[in-house]
Amino acid sequence: MKKIILVILLSVIFVLTSCADSDTEGYTFTDALQREITVDSCDRVAAMLGSFADVWMLAGGEVVATADDAWDDFDLPLDDNVANLGVSTKPNLELLIASDPDFVIASSKNSANLEMLDTLTALGITVAYFDVSTPEEYLSMMKICTDLTGREDLYLKNGIEVVAKVEEIRTLARADFATRTDAPSALFLRASAASIRAKGSDGNVLGEMLRDLGVINIADGENNAILENLSLEGVIAENPDFIFIVQVGDNAEAVESAVEELFSSNPAWSTLDAVKNDKVYFLDKKLYNLKPNARFAEAYEGLYEIISSEP
């Protein structure tokens, strides 16, 4: 009984010392746009991406508004009164303002989020921009969010411990590939029903993971033809060990059909080592396209299991 009472008291203290402190003193940090932001209140938070709503909730907070992927992709336990702002690329600004937020968590990579800055600032609403593609960027955001909520325990559990597990996997990968003559190589395809494009390693979740684990992304460096128009000639010249495909959008069946059509459109695809050796993988978009957040270690582990199977 004493333990239960202690837990309840600690929970109350966390709530009372979080944004209450921000109300009196403010909390200042630098966002992804290199702007100095001071948060005076975070009682009503709007997150412009489902992944950012996830981070805020992992930090012990609640949201009053967020994008539809918070429901569709992250399946967050949101109250019925949370405003659905629609798709993250075209959020409903009127609905956002009507939700009466005092703090908005936005993406520095989302043009619609950037365009709303002046409007929200003019209304006296604090807006901070974040950019998260790596575990360290996630940890940095978690630090800010848990400082605001006063939940250092969640920073340790959902931040520090997660990144520590990621580092263990990185160490295993470095030791593994140090014994090999050549590092494994991969072609990373981001596929929707309408288009399929190769992606480099910069600024996206899977690309950063591949580089982190020592995998050569054949679309990096001078291979612009692969990156810009998915040059089959360039892919054949590089002959990747793996092909990783990540779905964009919700129509998995249409994406698989588009990929099958691509591979069957030219028999040269079947000459690739990745295809001949059955090393073509459709990866979970929740782990490798969206931000995995507290599941970063799970994502790294799954990817390492695949690439370490290559003799």
PLM regions with names:
Residues 4-5, 19-51, 152-187, 247, ...:
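Bacterial Sec-exported substrate-binding components of ABC uptake systems
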Residues 7-15:
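Bacterial N-terminal signal peptides
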Residues 31-32, 82-94, 223-232:
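Short helix-initiation/N-cap motifs at beta->coil->alpha
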Residues 48-99, 103-110:
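A short, structured surface patch at a secondary-structure boundary
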Residues 70-72, 197-227:
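Alpha-helical, coiled-coil/dimerization segments enriched in small aliphatic residues
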Residues 93-106, 125, 232-245:
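Proline-aspartate-enriched helix->loop->beta-strand connector
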Residues 112-115, 128-144, 183-205:
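Extracytoplasmic ligand-binding site segments that recognize negatively charged/polar headgroups
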Residues 139-148, 153-156, 160, 242-311:
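Structured C-terminal subdomain patch of bacterial secreted/periplasmic proteins
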